[in-house]
């Protein structure tokens, strides 16, 4: 068979991003997948974005990746989350048409140069002198390549669970990968067993939406892609809805806990802390009288609704009772029952920050096989693995994004340094530099890198530079124009010799209020938004950077005064659990614990200072 520069194993979100990046960088690429049905599949929530994750998709786009364009082209609803809070946590979320999303990617694959799609199962890796040389298919055919990127998602020896019923299959009834796990173990890789799950799907026409809380999209022009945006008109967007569980729901779950695959002992894999099953919520948060559920559309072409927040591994008969206890679903038709899925992943501490294996040269890993969760986290890793394959191909240093540079950098640093014990999910709280890692400035942080690598097209980078020039011109006008120079502003409470940039720092003043006097005519909302954030939050960003410098000098602070970390304010339950279990001696040791970030360290320091002064 033909020899390739790169083989990508798996055509999910990580694999697609990797394959398009390597082929766009003129590397001959083979994309191998078990089943065409799995290309770009969204087996769980049909959405892209959300807190931290939406910023990751913007970062992917800024580097020259493809996920943002795919999401913009196939969205059913767009929203800006956390808009009432500071810009450090603003995020875009899109409800995606999962049928259109897969179709979009399949069409792109057909048109893509340097990319061949192969439907087959990889059963082994071809390795000589600790260097990967290609793959062996299940029919014993060999495909040679200089580099291999493994992006197998949740398919390695995967098993689905509904109560005591276990099926040897992949997500949504697809094929699973039966042999590659053994091949990795043979090469010396340590594997971990993880678990995730997905809720039931309900027939839309059987739902009573009357008393549900409506969650519409936005009429603002927002998109993931910086300079190729596709906007979904508001009147074409599909609404989501919110309902809540009730005591009847909780009672059904409590009475049947022993039938749950997870609580009944059928599952050995560890599930995601930040996306727990509904039975996990009832057990761990027993004091809560209700839990929120999102009723969301899956496609313009499907009559199915997704129950976000209601995943379970209960048997089918119990699921029916649980679902029909929910408001509006009393008489619903269940199209597909929920299930949990167990799968193999590698311990990601066996990877360099480039995502290359420490055990086998030229072998890279990306996506859920690295212990992460989420389409966005997967795509980001696929992109970075592809970038670093190209860097190595050209005998260049790997591209390693810093924690102060991108959420992608935060994620990769976390997983390769600390490892994972449960599916890793990106959160804004994991980023100690989150005021600098905003939705609006992904292009400022990463487009130069994308352009220098060769992924970002020159015309896109030129447009970015032109925008940057306009931003500098506006900032210069604000810094050099006084209130007294504008007749309409002479009667404000500011002194007439005050500059407009100081006037803009007032919370009630918007940049658009001042631009009507500006000789530079700007209509691009993206530019206006960037300038406004830079001016209004300049002080906060500088303060955060200073605090981070101080935190680096805390290595010798001892923690023996803390008996129970529940007393420390504003740290997560995950952090409390791990600190109470490990009992670190000092802040340096605490900072190395998986899941403990610099924000947590700052809270511990604050608590120690407080009890010292009491």
Curated annotation (Swiss-Prot):
GO molecular function: flavin adenine dinucleotide binding
Gene symbol of the encoding locus: mnmG
Main subcellular location of this protein, as a coarse class: cytoplasm
Key word NAD present: yes
Origin organism lineage: Bacteria, Bacillati, Mycoplasmatota, Mycoplasmoidales, Mycoplasmoidaceae
Cofactor: FAD
Binding site for NAD(+): 271-285
Protein name in the entry: tRNA uridine 5-carboxymethylaminomethyl modification enzyme MnmG
Signal peptide region: none
Family: Belongs to the MnmG family.
Classification via SMART domains: GIDA_assoc_3 (SM01228)
Subunit record text: Homodimer. Heterotetramer of two MnmE and two MnmG subunits.
Annotated GO biological process: tRNA methylation; tRNA wobble uridine modification
Gene Ontology cellular-component annotations: cytosol
Function: NAD-binding protein involved in the addition of a carboxymethylaminomethyl (cmnm) group at the wobble position (U34) of certain tRNAs, forming tRNA-cmnm(5)s(2)U34.
Subcellular location per the Swiss-Prot or TrEMBL entry: Cytoplasm
């Amino acid at each position: 068979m033909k020899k390739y520069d790169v083989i990508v194993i798996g055509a999910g979100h990580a694999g697609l991003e990797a394959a398009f990046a390597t082929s766009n960088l003129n590397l001959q690429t083979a994309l191998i997948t078990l089943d065409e049905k799995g290309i770009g599949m969204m087996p769980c929530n049909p959405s892209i974005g959300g807190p931290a994750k939406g910023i990751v998709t913007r970062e992917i786009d800024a580097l020259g990746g493809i996920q943002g364009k795919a999401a913009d082209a196939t969205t059913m609803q767009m929203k800006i989350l956390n808009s009432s809070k500071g810009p450090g946590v603003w995020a875009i979320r899109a409800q995606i048409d999962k049928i259109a999303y897969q179709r979009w990617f399949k069409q792109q694959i057909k048109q893509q140069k340097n990319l061949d799609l192969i439907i087959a199962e990889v059963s082994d890796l071809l390795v000589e002198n600790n260097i990967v040389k290609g793959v062996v298919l299940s029919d014993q055919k060999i495909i040679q390549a200089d580099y291999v990127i493994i992006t197998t998602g949740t398919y390695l020896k995967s098993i689905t669970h509904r109560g005591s019923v276990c099926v040897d299959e992949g997500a949504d009834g697809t094929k699973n990968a039966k042999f590659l796990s053994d091949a990795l173990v043979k090469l010396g890789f340590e594997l971990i067993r993880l678990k995730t799950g997905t809720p039931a799907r309900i027939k839309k026409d059987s739902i009573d939406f009357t008393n549900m809380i409506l969650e519409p999209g936005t009429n603002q022009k927002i998109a993931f892609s910086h300079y190729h945006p596709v906007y979904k008109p508001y009147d074409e967007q599909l609404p989501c809805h919110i309902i809540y569980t009730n005591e009847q729901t909780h009672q059904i779950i409590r009475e049947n806990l022993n039938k749950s695959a997870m609580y009944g002992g059928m599952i050995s894999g560890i599930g995601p802390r930040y996306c727990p099953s509904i039975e996990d919520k009832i057990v761990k948060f027993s004091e809560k009288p209700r839990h929120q559920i999102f009723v969301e559309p899956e496609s313009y072409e499907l009559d199915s609704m997704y129950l976000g927040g209601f995943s379970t591994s209960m048997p089918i008969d119990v699921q029916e009772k649980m679902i029909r206890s929910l408001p509006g679903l009393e008489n619903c038709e269940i199209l597909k029952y929920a299930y949990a899925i167990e799968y193999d992943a590698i311990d990601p501490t066996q990877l360099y920050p480039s995502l290359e294996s420490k055990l086998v040269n030229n072998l890279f890993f990306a996506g859920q096989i690295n212990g992460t969760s989420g389409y966005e986290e997967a795509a980001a890793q696929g992109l970075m693995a592809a970038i670093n394959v190209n860097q190595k191909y050209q005998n260049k240093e790997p591209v390693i994004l810093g924690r102060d540079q991108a959420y992608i950098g935060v994620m990769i640093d976390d997983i390769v340094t600390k490892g994972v014990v449960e599916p890793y999910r990106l959160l804004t709280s994991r980023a100690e530099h989150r005021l600098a890692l905003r939705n609006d400035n992904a292009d400022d942080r990463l487009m130069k890198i994308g352009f220098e690598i060769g992924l970002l097209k020159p015309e896109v980078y030129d447009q970015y530079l032109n925008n940057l020039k306009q931003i500098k011109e506006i900032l210069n006008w604000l810094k050099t124009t006084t209130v007294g120079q504008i007749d309409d502003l002479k009667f404000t409470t500011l002194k007439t010799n005050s500059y407009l940039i100081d006037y803009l720092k007032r919370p009630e003043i918007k940049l658009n209020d001042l631009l009507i006097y500006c000789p530079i005519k700007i209509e691009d909302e993206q530019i206006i938004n960037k300038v406004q954030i830079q001016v209004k939050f300049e002080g906060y960003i500088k303060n955060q950077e200073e605090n981070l410098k101080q935190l680096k000098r805390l290595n010798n602070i001892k923690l023996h005064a803390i008996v129970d970390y529940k007393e420390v304010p504003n740290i997560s339950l995950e952090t409390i659990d791990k600190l109470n279990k490990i009992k670190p001696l000092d802040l340096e040791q605490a900072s190395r614990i998986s899941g403990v970030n610099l924000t947590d360290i700052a809270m511990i320091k604050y608590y120690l200072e407080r009890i010292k002064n009491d």
